[in-house]
């Protein structure tokens, strides 16, 4: 909407295409959008992506927004997987779509988890288009929708009915495969993207170039309280923060690239399903939404274009905060 030619990545490209095409103002910008289907847990796909992006010419902005916080059970992905098997609409203008291999298999080993051990969420009789519309509608994940069995979150995921997930697990409980997935998605993929796309950013004619690493409070060392849960997620975000702190000053001094780590704020609740229902019944919900989170991620770029150079810092609530 600000005039950029934009590439976005996702494991579910057809779902993304449907969402963007359904936007009321899509005709104004959809010809400048490319949707890339990729699994960022696969470093070979990440490297291939960097080669394609670099070959396309100079790059002004890189936002490392992908994240795996907890692994969900396969049933949560049901509508998204089904949507990848269904045809795209023919009555709307669609963005360009590029897809790498093996991005959203029905039950890939990396998300299969405990399929036989836990209830699997599902919606019967819903089309991909109707599921997309439901995910984009207000109240789609309300307590009432959960109790009625019709909840879908803004990412298109069904409620994960497992009573335990890695958000509450301690170091001896976290599955080794999930540990690896989280590191690959949250810190290894951003490292590869930054390192291999730096020449393309250096070639940009823009006054400033930007790298925004989407971080979280989980990776903050100076926080007064740090519980024992989800150590694998904490260490992944801490690694992303250290990458930012280590490389940002040199990247700015050498190439005028402004790199920051940004906390989106509390926009999701990762606790197990029954815990979420209990606190929702008590009136609690995440204080921010996806629009709030996106605004915080975009803000360092807006500031830079206004002449305020922000780099080498952890940004929370729109201002630098302690690491």
Q: Where on the chain are the PLM-derived regions?
A:
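Short-chain dehydrogenase/reductase
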Residues: 1-181
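Flexible, glycine-rich beta-alpha linker
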Residues: 14, 217-225, 248, 254-284
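Conserved Rossmann-fold SDR core element
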Residues: 32, 251-264, 308-315
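Structural signature of the Rossmann-like NAD(P)-dependent dehydrogenase/reductase core
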Residues: 64-65, 96, 161-163, 207-219, ...
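C-terminal helical subdomain
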Residues: 105, 110-137, 145-146, 277-323
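Active-site helix of classical SDR
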Residues: 194, 236
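Catalytic Tyr-X3-Lys helix of short-chain dehydrogenase/reductase
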Residues: 198, 239, 244-253, 258
């Amino acid at each position: 909407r600000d005039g950029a030619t934009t590439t976005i990545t996702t494991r579910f490209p057809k779902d993304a295409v449907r969402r963007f095409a359904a936007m009321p103002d899509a005709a104004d910008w959809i010809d400048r959008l490319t949707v890339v289907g990729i699994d960022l847990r696969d470093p070979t796909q990440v490297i291939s992506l960097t080669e394609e992006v670099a070959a396309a010419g100079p790059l002004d902005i890189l936002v490392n927004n992908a994240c795996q916080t907890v692994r969900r059970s396969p049933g949560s992905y049901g509508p998204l997987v089904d949507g990848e098997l269904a045809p795209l609409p023919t009555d709307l203008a669609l963005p360009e779509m590029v897809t790498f291999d093996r991005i959203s298999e029905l039950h890939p080993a990396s998300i299969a988890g405990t399929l036989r051990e836990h209830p699997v969420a599902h919606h019967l009789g819903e089309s991909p288009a109707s599921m997309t519309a439901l995910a984009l509608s207000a109240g789609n994940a309300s307590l009432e929708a959960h109790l009625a069995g019709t909840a879908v979150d803004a990412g298109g995921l069904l409620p994960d009915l497992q009573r335990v997930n890695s958000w509450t697990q301690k170091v001896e409980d976290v599955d080794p495969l999930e540990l690896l997935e989280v590191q690959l998605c949250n810190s290894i993929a951003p490292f590869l993207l930054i390192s291999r796309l730096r020449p393309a950013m250096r070639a940009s004619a823009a006054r400033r170039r930007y790298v925004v690493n989407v971080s979280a409070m989980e990776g903050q060392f100076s926080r007064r309280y740090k519980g024992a849960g989800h150590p694998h997620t904490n260490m992944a975000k801490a690694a992303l923060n250290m990458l930012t702190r280590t490389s940002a000053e040199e990247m700015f001094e050498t190439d005028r690239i402004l790199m920051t780590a940004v906390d989106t704020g509390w926009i999701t609740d990762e606790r197990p399903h029954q815990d979420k229902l209990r606190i929702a019944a008590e009136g609690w919900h995440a204080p921010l939404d996806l629009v709030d989170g996106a605004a915080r991620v975009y803000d360092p770029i807006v500031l830079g274009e206004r002449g305020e150079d922000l780099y080498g810092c952890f940004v929370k609530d729109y201002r630098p905060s302690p690491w």
